[in-house]
Regions:
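Surface-exposed, low-hydrophobicity beta-strand/loop segments enriched in small/polar/acidic residues
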Residues: 85, 116-120
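Short, hydrophobic/amphipathic alpha-helical patches that form generic packing surfaces
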Residues: 43, 84-97
């Protein structure tokens, strides 16, 4: 989805009357609400975790230089199946601004689903309870013994 399509999708998810924005360069106040929400959501998602592995190989965007959406045809660099995650993240901001409990609930349910998919795919594996045991003269020490030394 393009930046413009993401903005239009957010407006539809918010069940706002009408269509639009027609362009992300629109200066209409109502359009700017959706444009800014999508722009900020994508920046926040990129900066949400320092261990994301979705950054492009060419290093065109990084944690210290994230992608900013600016024109209608800009496309977030993550695979298209995850683009709607940006919409659902932005929906949370809009839901709070509109004081809509229905939209807050929709945001909570859908963003948590997409966040789980993103973290499953774009963060490293977590291994719990496995650590190498240091040896000394071929003797193994327990963690408690190591801490006592």
């Amino acid at each position: 989805m393009t930046f413009l399509q993401l903005c239009q999708r957010l407006r539809a998810e918010c069940q706002d009357i009408g269509v639009g924005p027609a362009s992300v360069l629109s200066s209409a106040p109502r359009d700017q609400i959706y444009i800014q929400a999508i722009r900020e959501a994508w920046l926040e998602i990129q900066l949400l975790r320092p261990d994301w592995t979705f950054w492009p190989d060419d290093l065109s965007y990084t944690l210290t230089a994230p992608q900013s959406l600016a024109v209608d045809t800009d496309v977030p660099f993550i695979p298209e199946q995850y683009h709607v995650a940006i919409v659902y993240f932005a929906l949370g901001q809009r839901a709070l601004s509109a004081s809509s409990t229905e939209l807050v609930e929709k945001h909570n349910q859908l963003w948590s689903r997409y966040y789980s998919m993103l973290t499953d795919r774009y963060t490293g594996s977590v291994i719990v309870g496995v650590s190498p045991m240091p040896t000394s003269n071929n003797d193994q020490y327990s963690v408690g013994e190591i801490l006592a030394q």
